[in-house]
Amino acid sequence: MDALEITQKLISYPTITPKECGIFEYIKSLFPHFKTLECGENGVKNLFLYRIFNPPKDHAEEKHAKENTKPLHFCFAGHIDVVPPGNHWQSDPFKPVIKEGFLYGRGAQDMKGGVGAFLSASLNFNPKTPFLLSILLTSDEEGPGIFGTRLMLEKLKEKDLLPHMAIVAEPTCEKVLGDSIKIGRRGSINGKLILKGVQGHVAYPQKCQNPIDTLASVLPLISGVNLDNGDEYFDPSKLVITNLHAGLGANNITPASVEIIFNARHSLKTTKESLKEYLEKVLKDLPYTLELESSSSPFITASHSKLTSVLKENILKTCHTTPLLNTKGGTSDARFFSAHGIEVVEFGVINDRIHAIDERVSLKELELLEKVFLGVLEGLSEA
């Protein structure tokens, strides 16, 4: 069964976050020789399939998995949930259609195409040495993500089944398949700053303290400011204001306060603590309150790591393209793997139609991606 056939079947399930719609039963049917773990909460479902190939004859699989001699454990990871399709599609978003070399359907790029490719590669993998292959899937990546991959990894830690390496099949490529590998991601800090003033009548400014005037004096040091210089793989961390609110909507009353909502996408050089210190310095002697919350931490996998090297080699061999290693974009479930010390990268199809009307993936991409993933498995098992 090839990547196209599997992807078509996956698209046919209307798995809008966090609905699973029975898709895991189909996936489990493809892997009768794999062991299964499932967990979930609040309507979220997660599936983990795993198999030890070529275990020593004098060890049961479960016992062998817990010993110091356990083989390399590699995991393919992804999500089967999709965002709502909306209206104005040329065809039913959950009835896959092939047209002019493309497969159309919600999730074709994000990320049922990637999942279909690694499921097919896993089915065709037949190593000659001991190797533990696993597949981790969740129905909650597009949503809050609280009970998705993060929860499953916690369960795997309890069972001593955490992988050594993982590829998350996010749609990472920009123009051609193979042009981009995500070897890390920026962190995200959300903040709320309230500058306080004294409300009053605009005709008596001497009796007021307008917090908007206060904001104007420090705005150049807050809005769009770079918090560090970045490095080879990370852009400079930047503070971005996303919302401002002040006043009652009347034209003759100065506001009592102004609320500034902001976000900082940041590299390893900036932390919540360093951002707090910076803002405290900028706002020194001003009346304010500040709230900061880190929603995700930055991470990076070494550019010379075994996983990165094997993936690069197979991309060059199959796609005839040298991938750019980068950390651009938003957050992904790869951060949950990194938090457990797992060597993780992201690689998948082109992302030009993700979350869009008439989402589609090239048939050639699916074919090549399956070959890349199979090559990675073979390369790691032979190392």
From Swiss-Prot:
Top-level taxon in the UniProt lineage: Bacteria
GO molecular function, one term: acetylornithine deacetylase activity
Cofactor(s) this protein cannot do without: Zn(2+); Co(2+)
Cystine crosslinks: none
Enzyme class: hydrolase
Pathway involvement of the protein, from the record: Amino-acid biosynthesis; L-lysine biosynthesis via DAP pathway; LL-2,6-diaminopimelate from (S)-tetrahydrodipicolinate (succinylase route): step 3/3
BP term (GO), one: diaminopimelate biosynthetic process
Entry annotated with the keyword Membrane: no
Active site, per annotation: D81, E141 (proton acceptor)
SUPFAM superfamilies recorded: Bacterial exopeptidase dimerisation domain, Zn-dependent exopeptidases
Catalytic reaction annotation: N-succinyl-(2S,6S)-2,6-diaminopimelate + H2O = (2S,6S)-2,6-diaminopimelate + succinate
InterPro entries noted in UniProt: ArgE/DapE_CS (IPR001261), Bact_exopeptidase_dim_dom (IPR036264), DapE_proteobac (IPR005941), Peptidase_M20 (IPR002933), Peptidase_M20_dimer (IPR011650), Peptidase_M20A (IPR050072)
Keyword tags: Amino-acid biosynthesis, Cobalt, Diaminopimelate biosynthesis, Hydrolase, Lysine biosynthesis, Metal-binding, Zinc
EC nos: 3.5.1.18
Amino acids binding Zn(2+) 1: H79, D110, E170
Described purpose of this protein according to its UniProt entry: Catalyzes the hydrolysis of N-succinyl-L,L-diaminopimelic acid (SDAP), forming succinate and LL-2,6-diaminopimelate (DAP), an intermediate involved in the bacterial biosynthesis of lysine and meso-diaminopimelic acid, an essential component of bacterial cell walls.
The family this protein is said to belong to: Belongs to the peptidase M20A family. DapE subfamily.
NCBIfam families attached to this UniProt entry: dapE_proteo (TIGR01246), PRK13009.1 (NF009557)
Subunit structure: Homodimer.
Protein name: Succinyl-diaminopimelate desuccinylase
Native source species: Helicobacter pylori (strain ATCC 700392 / 26695)
Name of the gene this protein is made from: dapE
